[in-house]
Amino acid sequence: MDGHADKNNEVETAGGHRARLRRRLLDAGPKAFHDYELVEYLLALTIPRVDTKPLAKRLLHDFGGIGPLLSASADTLRREGLTDPTIAALKIADATALRLLESRIKDKPVLSSSDALGEYLHAAMAHARVEEVRVLFLNAKNMLIANEALWQGSVDEASVHVREVIARAIALSATAIIIVHNHPSGDPSPSNQDIRLTRDLVEAGRHMKVTVHDHVIVGVEGRTSMRAMGLI
């Protein structure tokens, strides 16, 4: 009987804590929450009658922060023992945040929204564990036509990638592009391959009347602009 009573007390305590979190969220907004409380609340949506604070803190510790946690793949999260409903709750939060940031660079000239663009690119790519190359295709007014991840992996095969990027730009009737890729190491410094790819893209684009505005490298330590470095 005592064990059953203790269990009921735990459930009631967890329920009361969640109600207090919900009230604080509605009254003060998400800025009043620590990262672990945001994750705790997300976990509580799919893990009933359990105190999710310890799990939230463990996940943040294991992944190194809320960004790497939310951007982790479903398979990686499963290896942490999370169920699919819980993984879906984390991924929908990640997708919503990215969609919000992406909305800030739509319907306006991308080059005049550099801060918003940087925030979006960092959120979308900085915490990825594999290298990804993304291209922003722009029209003559530098408005975003398409935002596409073209490939994952090394940029070593520069000539193949150059043809793919320029061909896609022509197919979309884009007049300019911004190429972006991440460094999973965290260091956004360009490699020799990055510099070579940039120069090859600029040259190929010139022949096909596609302007390469920039090549941005993103890492958890920051981001690097090839144009700002004088490489374009």
Language-model features: where?
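Divalent-metal-activated hydrolytic enzyme cores
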Residues: R199-I232
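Long, highly charged, low-complexity intrinsically disordered interaction regions
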Residues: M1-T76
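Long, charged amphipathic helices and adjacent flexible linkers at domain junctions
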Residues: A97, L101-L121
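Short HxH-centered metal-ligating active-site micro-motif
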Residues: Q152-S191
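Small-residue hinge/turn detector
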Residues: T83-D84
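Short acidic/polar active-site loop segments enriched in Thr and Asp
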Residues: K31, T175-A176, T211
